[in-house]
Each structure stands twice: as C-alpha cells, then as structure tokens.
Amino acid sequence: MASITLKDLVKSYGDTEVLHHIDGEINDGEFIVIVGPSGCGKSTLLRMIAGLETVTSGDIKICDRVVNDLEPANRDIAMVFQNYALYPHMSVRENMGYGLKIRGNSKADINRRVEEAAEILEIGQYLDRKPRQLSGGQRQRVAMGRAIVRDPQVFLFDEPLSNLDAKLRVQMRLEIRKLQQRLGVTSIYVTHDQVEAMTLGDRLMVLNGGYVEQFGTPIELYDRPATLFVAGFIGSPSMNFLPAEIDAGMVTLENGARLAGGGSAAGKVTLGLRPEHLVADDNGPVEVNVQLCEQLGAITLLHGHLNGTDTECVASMPGHVTAAPGTLMRFSIAPENLHMFDPQTGKRVAE
C-alpha cells in the first residue's frame, strides 16, 4: 500500500496549460475520487499518476519516491479502464493472468492469484469463458480481477462504469467500494458523476478547467462548498442561486423578501439554497411561482421562479405533492442552511 503526493503539478501541451499547479496528499489506503465535468483534466491527471502522460513541472510521489521519470510498469500500480480492454481471443483466466505471465511469474503463482481474485469477485464460474460470452458487469469484474492479481500498491480507475446501464452502475459502484475496503489498497477513481463520487470517495478532488476547486470529504463539500462551482456541482438536484444583499444579519432577496441569516457578512452576495432545505411554510419568506411538479416517488421536485422575478428556484418535498402551474408556494429555510458566495470571485463568503 502507498501514500501519494501531488506537488505543484502542471501539465501543458505546447503553449496550452491544461492542469494548473495541482497539490494533494493521498493517505495510505484512502479511496480518492477525482470528479468534474468533461474536459476538466481529471483523466489527464490520472494518466500522469499512471505514467501514461509526462509531467511538465512539479512532482508525483508514491511512498515518498518521486516517480516522474519512472515507466508505468515500474510504479507498482494497476489501472482499470472504461472500455475493459480485454483480449477477445483469450479466456477470462488468460486475460486476468496475462500481465503476470509477461512479467515471468510461475504458472502455479498465476493460477493461485487468478483463483483468489475470481473468488473475491465471484466470477469463478466464468474463468473458462471468452469475454464475448459475458455481460458488461461481468467484463468489468474481469478487468478489476486483472488489476487485483497484480497485488499493486495503487489502484487507478478511469471512469470504469460509464459503459454500464444505470441499475448496474449502482450495483458495481457498491462492489468496487466493498472491494477497496476489503483489500485496503490506495485507490484513485475518476468520474464525471457527482453521485458516484459522493458514494465512493473518502475524499473528493473537484476539478474545473484544470484547477482544484476543493479537496475534502463528501460531507464537507456538501455542507460547506468553497466555491459557486462546487456548490452547483455537488448535490442533486443542484443548489438554487439567488441574487441577494446582506445587512445587519438579514438577507434581502431581489423581490424584497427577507431571511434571517448572513452573520457578519455585508453587501451583495449570491445566495445558495439547496432544494431539500426549503421547507413548506405558509408564512415562509421564500415565495415560489410553481411551473412544474416532477414526481419521483419518494420525493417531488417543484420547479418554478422566485415570485416576481425570472430567477429559477427548485424545492424538494417528501412524498407526493401536486401543484397547478402558477401556484404560489411559500418556504422557509434555517439560517445554518444559507450559503453565501462573492458574486465576483465565486468564493464562499466568511460568515
């Protein structure tokens, strides 16, 4: 097992810098998820750690050893890809053991490791099948098995569930998490799916445009997002953002409604309200002109606008709720659930 250090890491292609001074400490045995939208640099960062991309400047350390110039084969890592990367003419057993065979391991050692990994992943009955005879989830287990037999210091996962349907993704992400906890191997996982990130990671590194927006636990990112980007990216449905002004511990919305909160902050802010924190209240200060009810079974999402404005607002209510278009509904929100951001910098305002 291994700790990993990213120190002032920069990646450029020609004159274009795509990763900007990335810093991060990953502890031994930790499961880290790098999450962000398409094109943010998350897969590039993972490939740099793997040794598949060169480092422009900065250092990558594995177990306190700088590995910038080490070949991938010498970094003691194993990678699981989105497209499985299985050899179609080989059996599952041969696919899982092929890397060990190339490294010169004995046949007995290869068979032992493959059998152990197959037992962990519950694919022992498929060892003599070809990949074409397997489902997508089974193929992904084989790809993970190929990584496990290596007995590496670090697992790297590059969006391994993207090709699976929604139900199977939920099942497989739970299996990956249980597997990582069982093996205790330091793991880095890349995804664009914030729900996947929240359920898998001990900590999340949120990337945006090649910059680290925030690096913390899922709960830290949910409860105290450091920037507008993190606030809007983490959580489903997304946080509501309303123009507001703070004065003397009161928050005034653009339609004149006033909410208690804001602490010692003052001036114009972007106010963030999570839909699930809006509580139906006939005397509440937040009045929403409902345009659409989205029935999801356990909850109902009410989509509309802050009354008297064009600012969109979504409320999440438990159970089954119906409201005709144009219905005015009032909501209250606890002061501790208000999030305030500087409208110029996008950074969280000190409370």
Curated annotation (Swiss-Prot):
Residues forming the ABC transporter domain are 4-234
A Pfam cross-reference name: OB_MalK
Biological-process GO terms, alphabetical = carbohydrate transport; glycerophosphodiester transmembrane transport
Its catalytic activity?
sn-glycerol 3-phosphate(out) + ATP + H2O = sn-glycerol 3-phosphate(in) + ADP + phosphate + H(+)
Name the PROSITE patterns on file: ABC_TRANSPORTER_1 (PS00211), ABC_TRANSPORTER_2 (PS50893), UGPC (PS51315)
CDD domains attached to this UniProt entry = ABC_MalK_N
**Subcellular compartments:** Cell inner membrane
Q: What is its EC number?
A: 7.6.2.10
In the record, what terms sit under GO molecular function? ABC-type glycerol-3-phosphate transporter activity; ATP binding; ATP hydrolysis activity
What keyword terms does UniProt attach to this protein? ATP-binding, Cell inner membrane, Cell membrane, Membrane, Nucleotide-binding, Sugar transport, Translocase, Transport
Residues bound to ATP: G36, P37, S38, G39, C40, G41, K42, S43
Any one GO CC term of the record? ATP-binding cassette (ABC) transporter complex, substrate-binding subunit-containing
- What NCBIfam families has UniProt attached to this entry? PRK11650.1 (NF008653)
- PANTHER family given for it? MALTODEXTRIN IMPORT ATP-BINDING PROTEIN MSMX, SN-GLYCEROL-3-PHOSPHATE IMPORT ATP-BINDING PROTEIN UGPC
The protein's assembly and partners? The complex is composed of two ATP-binding proteins (UgpC), two transmembrane proteins (UgpA and UgpE) and a solute-binding protein (UgpB).
**Family (UniProt):** Belongs to the ABC transporter superfamily. sn-glycerol-3-phosphate importer (TC 3.A.1.1.3) family.
| Protein's name in the database | sn-glycerol-3-phosphate import ATP-binding protein UgpC
Gene name, per UniProt, is ugpC
